[in-house]
Amino acid sequence: MSVWDDILTPTDREVIRRGGYGKPRGLGERPALLLIDPQYNYAGADKPILDQIQEWPSGVGESAWRAVERLKSLIQAFREKKRPVLYTRQVQKNIAFDGFAAKAVRSSSQYLEGSKGTSIVEDIAPREGDLVIDKSYASAFYGTPLLSILIKLKVDTLIVAGGTTGGCVRATCVDAVSRNFDVAVVEDCVFDRISASHKVALLDLWMKYCDVISSYAALDYVTRL
């Protein structure tokens, strides 16, 4: 059962069946793990979302921290196989000219370089050999050297986790597929503030763009390389 099953109407299910949506794309042999914005601004505190929203207005709360916990073994598996582990951070150098999220009221200082909010959560912090790419917009490809790095590393597949599902994760996955990478989103390692956004984004990615797999399937894939 997929996380989006409870939002589908009978007509939706028939459209998917008759239209042939959601067929597996498959994964290649040279993957990288791409962790989208696993930083304090978006993870927030390990509490129910409403209990931490005043301190972390963009934070997802406890569901993000459950994803972080599951990510530990996946990150370790990639490192053991000597496959690339890449992180992105949403970070602004100058809030007046940098950044895109103008539709939410936020404290600009949380998004400036040097604030705790821009730091990757300590539980899954990068190690020597991992790469961290700073970005200012939703897609990890926009205005960053990510594509050049992936080409240099001869990566053919991206295993994507992080947040938020309906924002930066979705934008990055669509751009990755548009650049001819095989892509899988790890369903239980992505997170969003809004349950509906999370489910609809995963449904849309699964239907039209990339594979959506569990952390167990992702672990099995990388350990078999």
Task: Please give the residue ranges for each predicted region.
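Acidic-leg catalytic submotif of subtilisin-like serine proteases
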Residues: 31-46
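A short, N-terminal amphipathic alpha-helix
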Residues: 65-84
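Catalytic-core segment of enzymes that process non-peptidic bonds
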Residues: 87-90, 95
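A short acidic, glycine-rich active-site loop
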Residues: 55-69, 107-115
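Active-site loop/turn elements of alpha/beta-hydrolase fold enzymes
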Residues: 38, 90, 188
